[in-house]
UniProtKB/Swiss-Prot annotation:
Designated name of the protein: Peptide chain release factor 3
Annotated family: Belongs to the TRAFAC class translation factor GTPase superfamily. Classic translation factor GTPase family. PrfC subfamily.
InterPro entries: EF-G-like_DII, EFG_III/V, G_TR_CS, P-loop_NTPase, PrfC, RF3_C, RF3_dom_3_sf, RF3_GTP-bd
Positions annotated to bind GTP: 20-27, 88-92, 142-145
Function of the protein: Increases the formation of ribosomal termination complexes and stimulates activities of RF-1 and RF-2. It binds guanine nucleotides and has strong preference for UGA stop codons. It may interact directly with the ribosome. The stimulation of RF-1 and RF-2 is significantly reduced by GTP and GDP, but not by GMP.
Amino acid sequence: MSNPTLAAEVGRRRTFAIISHPDAGKTTLTEKLLLYGGAIDMAGSVRARRNQRHATSDWMAMEQQRGISITSTVLQFVYRDCQINLLDTPGHQDFSEDTYRTLAAADNAAMLIDAAKGIEAQTRKLFDVCRMRGIPIFTFINKLDRPGREPLELLDEIEKVLGIDVYPVNWPIGMGDTFRGVFDRLEHTVHLFDRTTGGKKMAPVTVGAIGDERMRVLMDEGTYAQIVEEIELLDGVGVPFDIERVAQGKLTPVFFGSAANNFGVQLFLDAFIRFASRPGTRSANTGVISPVAEDFSGFVFKIQANMDPQHRDRVAFIRVCSGKFEKDMTVHHTRSGKKVRLSRSLKLFGQERETVEEAYAGDIVGVINPGTFAIGDTICLGKPLAFEGIPLFPPEHFATLRNPNPSKYKQFLKGVTQLREEGAVQVLFHQDEAKRDPILAAVGQLQFDVVRFRLESEYHVETILEPLPWTLARWITAKQLEDLETIDWYFDSLGLKDHEGRLVILFKTPWGFQQMSERNPHLQFHEIAPL
């Protein structure tokens, strides 16, 4: 393949993740982006989803029962000749690890904000991750059809709390019950929307210039006068639109709308494919890897077991970073040093799947994984390389997981191992091998519920969960191996090992950790497992 052809394919890719606090409307926005992208012909509302229809991105049984997203899902579709790779992330804060891994595979982020609530805790945390990665952030302020805070107040909060400049690409016309549409500041056009039943179909829209008499008639005089005044204010005091600052993550384009009613969704999607970053370079141990480099490379950012209940297989999600992926290609697996044939490669759309013949930088490919891959693994052609690893979040909740049925222990251990490998939970073990019950370590309590639910539904194993009083963990390293044999133990601590045999110590309080670290200055204490 010639470089111009490769560059053209890469230039068509737009890969992004949606970040938000729970209940900001992320699942609804995802569905509406798919609706306007032509990937589905009817959007399923949350209310309908609880009865018959399930959101396209929510495929796991527990997600369908509870109406929440607890895993990241890949949704791919073509819109206006652009290949869109939409990485739908968990909305629940207990699953921030999965979201972090997904953001490692994204080139852009869409930050979703509830107009009534503004910046919330999870939004801020995930924004900080995006900022650390330096990726562009596009903001969609949702639920303008409900009572909410003033738009100027919301913009001010984004600037002050998140420390990023804002440029409202469009501006709401009305609020709550009077929300009619938006003014597009870049195109200088008014977009007035009509509601559809349940928001299942695209919203009819009337478009015209702000000075068009027809548009003035459709808006009442008070609304028209207010929108003209607010636009003049924005033009006079706001920062200018600068695509380079957007690409650097220093300026966020802001869009107003209502995902439930389809107001402003297409304007957001159109602007996104116009301004979003294309796949960029990636840092590896051999240097910077260009997306248009001839040799294929990619990394595993997610592993999901039992996506297909009929086959009980495991899928490794690979973000393509350079070159061209081809079905049945044999690649170098950097961690093991072995050659691996990628014979079963899939394009995924929620639970649906089809064979992938080729893919380019920015694309996400699913590969049936018989246990070869782990999260963070690099695969490549040409000179061996390794991309930067994906760290874990420090766990804050711990519990012993027991198997009450000895005859099911093999199945129990298989399930726990596979769920650990896909990042559903961290698993620790007693140093005394006679104590076989694993200790689960999680960022949030809901992770425990998911593990138990999946062990029962997918592996047919019943479990007993016993919460533990520990609140923090530290991985221990030392310059000299013998130093690990001469630890001065603090009485209120517990020494364990992780799946790779590395020493981990649990503490009940930060004070206990402080005592332990002061007693052992020759040791290094790490919040997360060293890469």
